[in-house]
Amino acid sequence: MLLRRLVRPLLLVLPLLALIGGARPALADPGDIAAASRGVVRVVLVRSGFLGTSMLGHGSGFAVEPDMIVTNAHVVQDAHGDGNVVIGVIPSQGSASYPAHIVAYSPANDLALLQLGNHAALQPLTLFPGAVSDGMQIAAVGYPGNVDAAQGLNAGDMVTPQDTVKTYGQVSSGRSSRQFDTILHTAQLGAGNSGGPLLDTCGRVLGVNSFGTVSDNGADSSFFFAISMRELQPFLKSAGVIPHLASLPCTSIADLDRADSQRSADDQARVAAEALARTAAREHAFDKARHDAELDVLSERDNGLALAALLLVAAIGAATFAFLQRQRGQVRGTRIGVGLLIVLVLGAGFAWILRPSLSAIDDRAKDRMAEVDASGTPAPDGDGSTAAAAAPQKLICVLDPQRSRVTVSDITDVPLQWSAGGCVNGKTQYGLAQDGWSRVLVPNGEDTIAVTHFDPAAHSYTVERFLMGIDDMNRARAERSKIAFPPCGASEDLARQLGSAQAAIKTLLPAEPNERMRYTCQPAR
């Protein structure tokens, strides 16, 4: 506020720079660039003296820690060693401005580090330490003075939070500054862009915009230089700053959706092929079972026929024996012969009757298939109780990079304990809706909304992160305050009520998340 009072009476006359060339199509993800812009600031210099105050100029910068700003050394050179020059930092959102002082100054590679006062808590940007390829799509974010002049902004407006200006282009590699390592690119810059970040399509910092080329007629041309990571990382390390780094390839949500659709189609084709294979295998197994059953039945019928014939032959022998005994007057022998005859005839009849019928072939084949099916079905657990199924599952969830888009978050394994009813880690109750179990997390200390999903059947855990502006974040916090969150392990009705209540927050979210992290969960060891 002191800075605003110092410069409000002043009018800053800015030169209107000629606009050269047409804008390239914005191929970067607007959501990621907007999210990164939350940590981009305007850096202003004001001199105070006996004759009053005057604004010396302004540039851009970006946060690498909540209270640490990177900018160009030439932006703050007038304040270096001069106690009469005040540095002010104005963020792109909110209503506050912050005093700053130089903590590291390196004119050799045009870098400076500022520390903010007044308990500043800006959104740090993430740096990309990987290789920058030729033709790579990029975005420059900052506060070009020609835009301020075209809008008619006065000095008071300059110390009021304003939206950043974003321009887009591509890397033109192969040429670097002789003084220090730089990235040559075509994203339009103007006076005032100095110190702002050069971003990739995921909103990660590739370099610090520094200067542009000048054509023969003195006008800005369409090639510009940004200080590369080879200069920035050692500079920050020497200053004791550990920035957040992310080196995964930059993929879009649309790319993930296409890959998921293709993967789903492949899975459906695989499932269909497996179903056909199982059907063919079952038909083959049934044919074999029927063939085996047919052989068994025919064999048993032949054995029964042979046994009946053998018994009939024996019965003829018994009849002959009984006849001879009667001719000889042997009553007892006759009775024995007749008894044997009766037994053998009955045995032959039973042997014939007990032969399996041909219709038994199909029945036996079905019985054999039932045995095969039963042997392929896993047995239930020993206790077989529902209590065992409802016991908490301790899982460890590992990121699947091929199905994830990670731009600014750290990659770590996630321990997760899931209980039936939607209780996570014994303290967080998930809501139940048509899309399954989920929880919307709206923190107070970070302008990020996370929507987490868990599929108990597939053991799949998904986190979608939305990097929000301060106004949208405040609206989401207001909606969160209206929700009565049930205790962990609540009834299904309460879980469904929570799922419905969270929908009010989801309506405030952008169409696509900035990050989508898919995890595969396995039992923890």
Describe the function of each predicted region.
Residues 31-32, 58, 64-66, 70-108, ...:
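Catalytic-histidine neighborhood of serine endopeptidases
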Residues 36-54, 112, 117-124, 151-237:
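Active-site region of chymotrypsin-like
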Residues 40, 65-87, 91-150, 179-182, ...:
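Conserved active-site neighborhood of the chymotrypsin/trypsin-like protease fold
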Residues 47-66, 97-99, 304, 518-524:
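A conserved glycine-rich beta-strand in the N-terminal activation segment of trypsin-fold
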Residues 75-79, 123-131, 136-181, 190, ...:
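Flexible, gly/ser-rich surface segments that form the specificity/activation loops bordering the active-site cleft
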Residues 146, 210-295:
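C-terminal cap/linker of serine protease catalytic domains
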Residues 284-371:
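C-terminal single-pass membrane-anchor helix
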Residues 360-424:
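Membrane-interface segments at or immediately adjacent to transmembrane helices
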